[in-house]
Design a protein with these regions (language model features):
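Hydrophobic h-region of N-terminal signal peptides that target proteins for export
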Residues: 9-17
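Sec-dependent signal peptide recognition
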Residues: 1-8
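Alpha-carbonic anhydrase
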Residues: 4, 16-257
Length: 257
């Protein structure tokens, strides 16, 4: 019991020295108008720039119920180990930023489209629902092509064995909102992917203001395990950082064969 408590304490304890010794330890929010998840139904009323949050017809996340099986291209994850720029507590989630291209060195290839990984972040529980149910958490890996197209990969996370890469991140996440830490570590995000990369795909949006549409989402069908203690560590900071599911409005969700 004592060992379990010590393990949980180690997971929950932020790396204070990392934040204090960071090159920049204060995060500058990109949102000119503050928002919260509790205000999700009223985001469009907070700022005209958030109008798509209510007026948009291709919003995310969604509840994946019915799918159309299609001969879709395989997802090629050309991820590599690279130094992280910041581990950020932005007041809504824990987000990891990469340096500008080509320094991240990690790419998603879908058919003839090439996207660079720009950042990733977490939600608890998952924003994506499968047949009416969320997963314990979700990892969102966000990518952008040279033409400016955005692609998000959702990796569902479920309680099970501890994930060493997630643990590495948790050891560097700032406990205080508005702080960012230069981690000084290399990390390969491929270690947070499942072996099987079959997926669901649809056209959606960012899941936070300004809710910009035109995002191609790939929701991986196979979940990845993280430990209950790792889920608790995140929940201590963000127990419920999710946007409610949005109407499909006639959109078709395709499923890889």
């Amino acid at each position: 019991m004592i060992c379990s408590s010590l393990l949980l304490a180690t997971i929950l304890l932020p790396t204070i020295n990392s934040a204090q010794n960071a090159e920049h330890d204060h995060y500058v929010s990109p949102w000119k108008t503050p928002w919260t998840y509790e205000q999700a139904a009223h985001w469009s009323e907070l700022d005209p720039d958030y109008a798509a949050c209510n007026a948009g017809k291709q919003q995310s996340p969604i509840d994946i119920q019915q799918t159309e099986k299609s001969p879709l291209p395989a997802l090629r994850f050309e991820y590599t180990s690279a130094p992280l720029k910041y581990v950020i507590n932005n007041g809504h989630t824990i987000r990891v930023d990469y340096h500008d291209a080509p320094q991240s060195g990690s790419f998603l290839i879908v058919g003839d489209q090439r996207y660079q990984l720009t950042q990733f972040h977490f939600h608890r529980p998952s924003e994506e629902y499968l047949h009416g149910k969320p997963s314990d958490m979700v990892l969102h890996l966000m990518h952008k092509s040279a033409e400016g197209k955005v692609a998000g990969v959702a990796v569902l996370l479920k309680s099970g064995a501890a994930n060493a890469t997630v643990q590495q991140l948790w050891e560097h996440m700032p406990a205080t909102e508005g702080q960012q830490a230069v981690s000084g570590v290399d990390l390969n995000p491929a270690a947070m992917l499942p072996r099987a990369t079959g997926y669901y795909t649809y056209t959606g949006s960012q899941t936070a203001p300004p809710c910009s549409e035109g995002v191609t989402w790939f929701v991986l069908k196979t979940p990845v395990e993280i430990s209950a203690a790792q889920i608790t560590a995140f929940a201590t900071l963000y127990p419920h950082d999710v946007r409610p599911v949005q109407p499909l409005n006639g959109r078709v969700v395709k499923e890889s064969q």
